């Protein structure tokens, strides 16, 4: 096992956080918390599983988190067109009035502490693990809240695409029937069509760019044989890196542990949102996946009223402990539900 060797200056600074002199201890603890401030702020968002879905916007003091909604809604596209003009005549007027969405922000907080002996003995390994647990608590909460917002928007839109049965909008039934829980490339193809047709307008109005799915679905992809894909594509799958992002038809596939039978996001859709799996062609489907249009970052917003603040906790000394606590305030919103849909297989 390799142990990291820390400079004497860092060792002395850590030991000072457990110093018997209250003034020395308070100063050292404050400096320790200040040093953690920026790395923790970065780490909280670098390690989330939202994968750049949300546009993060830090609000100025006193600013409101309000966003204008799109003038054009599905089904209304034909009302917003240009006109062929006669040689003489008045240009038609078009009056629009939009709505605004006010996004509520809320505060989340966390804390962690450790025995003073770890500071006295300069046990960086123990204390850094504790700090990673502190950071992971924020990451876990951000992931959960952000994805519940996406899942709620997808459920509210109500568009569910399957590889079995008739396709949305077109009613096509040419796709062969797949076994329940089996992820197929036909599902991606149908989701692409549904995303574009459901966006309204022409083919540039929306497109499927990313799909978030379970590890078992990716396992199905790795098991595709020559009846599913050609040898060249199979080789690309076999030699892909451990954490490389696979693509099918130009759609990026994101493997997530939270999707799959009995997993967190699956349970949220079924239990909290009361969504049940369909039975298509006498086959009851088993899993959900989520498709997003991230071609334009205009729909998924994360207003941040207060970035993560971390402070030392001087009240723990009587208990022979030291620690930190902190909070941040933010919100989540999906402004345009046309950018999200559910896949089921």
Q: In which residue ranges do the predicted regions lie?
A:
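Short, flexible loop/turn elements at secondary-structure junctions
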Residues: 116-118, 215-217, 328
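Alpha-helical scaffold segments that mediate packing/assembly in large oligomeric complexes
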Residues: 114-198
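Aromatic-anchored, glycine/proline-accented short structural segments
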Residues: 179-249, 253
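Sequence/fold signature of self-assembling virion shell proteins
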Residues: 2-8, 224-345
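Assembly/oligomerization interface modules of large self-assembling protein complexes
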Residues: 34-108
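Residues forming anionic-ligand binding surfaces in small-molecule and nucleic-acid pockets
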Residues: 105-117
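Intrinsically disordered, low-complexity terminal tails
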Residues: 1-35, 342-344
């Amino acid at each position: 096992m390799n142990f990291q060797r820390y400079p004497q200056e860092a060792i002395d600074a850590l030991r000072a956080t457990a110093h018997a002199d209250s003034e020395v201890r308070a100063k050292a603890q404050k400096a320790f918390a200040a040093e953690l401030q920026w790395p923790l702020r970065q780490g909280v968002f670098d390690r989330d599983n939202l994968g750049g879905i949300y546009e993060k916007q830090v609000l100025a003091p006193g600013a409101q988190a309000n966003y204008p909604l799109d003038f054009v809604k599905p089904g209304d596209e034909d009302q917003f067109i240009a006109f062929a003009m006669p040689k003489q005549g008045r240009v038609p007027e078009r009056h629009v009035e939009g709505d605004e969405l006010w996004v509520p922000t809320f505060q989340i907080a966390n804390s962690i502490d450790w025995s003073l002996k770890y500071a006295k003995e300069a046990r960086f390994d123990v204390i850094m693990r504790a700090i990673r647990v502190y950071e992971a608590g924020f990451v876990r909460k951000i992931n959960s809240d952000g994805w519940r917002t996406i899942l709620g928007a997808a459920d509210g839109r109500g568009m569910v695409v399957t590889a079995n049965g008739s396709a949305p909008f077109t009613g096509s039934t040419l796709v062969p029937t797949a076994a329940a829980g089996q992820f197929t490339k036909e599902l991606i193809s149908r989701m692409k069509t549904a995303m574009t047709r459901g966006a309204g307008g022409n083919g540039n109005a929306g497109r499927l760019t990313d799909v978030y799915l379970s590890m078992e679905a990716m396992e199905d992809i790795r098991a595709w044989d020559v009846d599913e894909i050609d040898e060249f594509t199979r080789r690309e799958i076999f030699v892909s890196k451990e954490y490389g992002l696979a693509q099918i038809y130009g759609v990026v596939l994101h493997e997530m542990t939270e999707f799959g039978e009995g997993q967190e996001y699956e349970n949220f859709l079924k239990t909290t949102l009361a969504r049940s799996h369909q039975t298509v062609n006498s086959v009851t489907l088993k899993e959900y996946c989520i498709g997003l249009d991230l071609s334009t970052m205009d729909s998924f917003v994360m207003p941040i009223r207060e970035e993560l603040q971390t402070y030392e906790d001087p009240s723990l000394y009587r208990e022979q402990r030291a620690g930190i606590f902190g909070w941040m305030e933010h919100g989540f919103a999906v402004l345009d539900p046309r950018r999200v849909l559910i896949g089921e297989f």
